[in-house]
């Protein structure tokens, strides 16, 4: 038996993965066995938020028939086809992220375990405060050159969703390369000038080398041509992009997860500068995407 476990936590860069074999894999599956069904109206799978969104578990060899081949564990619950339950061991994620857990082997950050534990705590706090509510879209000036907000086109649960990230979505440029090839969906990779640090000063120029146009004075106004995007940074950790739609509101795609038009508080996004962006605390700049004049790797 072998499991591939992806820590779904980044938006721009690929998420880290670990693999478990044999007894470790069997023990993990014992701990994630569905226990009690979640109540109707409970928080759904947290795919749409920025920051930690759970563990994506793939059974890649000798799968257990009691569980789907792929499922998500988040904040002590399991989500999958016809699954929305608490798990047998509600402390599983804390163990996974701890110094003796599999996350200790992840080296994408200097202290990934501590970072993951902090993010896990924030997700649980978000879950406890969650209150489902309906969104009413206010009337806003239209951006006639901007793409329509069509989440169903991107959210296919397959190739388009899994292998295009926030940069692909912001640029409205499908490549199907994210997580598959070096530089897939990364600013500057197509032009040979990929960023070398996760800062505004590094990621912004990398995007400009791909053909985006710096537009810091846009102040959330629709450009006369092309469409407006915005770059934000989790310093030293990750980057994220938003795009302004034809309805004047913003939307985004956190990594391989579905496209959404709400922020981490579940609110519509009239301005990304004031949205709840989670760990992406640095608002860098606005840029303009001229259709047909950019390239994404």
Name what the model sees in each region.
Residues 103-131, 246-297:
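Active-site or metal-binding loop neighborhoods of secreted/extracellular toxin and effector enzymes
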Residues 37-39, 65, 177-181, 237-243, ...:
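Substrate-binding/catalytic groove segments of enzymes
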Residues 190-257:
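...with weaker cross-activation on analogous glycine-rich loops/strands in unrelated enzymes
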Residues 51-53, 166, 226, 238, ...:
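Residues that flank catalytic or metal-binding motifs in active/ligand-binding sites
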Residues 132-213:
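Cysteine-nucleophile protease catalytic domains, especially the papain-like/related folds used
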Residues 54-62, 89, 229, 254, ...:
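N-terminal nucleophile
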Residues 28-38, 169-176, 206, 210, ...:
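Structured segments of extracytoplasmic/periplasmic soluble domains
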Residues 1-134:
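Function-determining sites in protein domains
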């Amino acid at each position: 038996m072998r499991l591939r476990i992806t820590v779904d936590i980044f938006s721009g860069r690929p998420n880290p993965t670990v693999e478990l074999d044999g007894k470790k894999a069997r023990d993990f599956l014992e701990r994630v066995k569905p226990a009690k069904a979640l109540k109707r109206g409970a928080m759904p799978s947290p795919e749409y938020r920025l920051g930690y969104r759970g563990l994506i578990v793939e059974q890649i060899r000798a799968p257990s028939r009691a569980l789907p081949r792929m499922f998500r564990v988040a904040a002590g619950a399991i989500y999958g086809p016809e699954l929305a339950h608490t798990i047998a061991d509600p402390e599983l994620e804390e163990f996974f992220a701890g110094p003796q857990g599999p996350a200790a082997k992840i080296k994408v950050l200097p202290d990934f375990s501590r970072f993951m534990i902090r993010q896990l705590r924030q997700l649980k706090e978000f879950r406890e405060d969650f209150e489902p509510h309906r969104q009413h879209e206010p009337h806003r000036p239209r951006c006639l050159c901007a793409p329509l907000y069509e989440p169903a086109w991107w959210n296919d649960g397959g190739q388009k969703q899994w292998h295009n990230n926030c940069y692909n979505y912001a640029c409205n440029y499908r490549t199907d390369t994210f997580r598959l090839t070096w530089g897939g969906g990364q600013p500057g990779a197509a032009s040979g000038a990929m960023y070398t640090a996760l800062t505004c000063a590094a990621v912004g120029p990398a995007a400009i080398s791909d053909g985006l146009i710096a537009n810091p004075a846009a102040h959330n106004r629709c450009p006369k041509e092309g469409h407006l995007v915005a770059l934000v940074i989790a310093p030293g950790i990750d980057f994220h992009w938003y795009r302004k739609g034809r309805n004047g509101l913003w939307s985004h795609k956190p990594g391989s997860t579905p496209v959404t038009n709400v922020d981490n508080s579940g609110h519509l996004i009239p301005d990304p500068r004031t949205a709840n962006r989670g760990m992406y605390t640095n608002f860098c700049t606005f840029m303009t995407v001229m259709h047909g004049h950019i390239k994404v790797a």
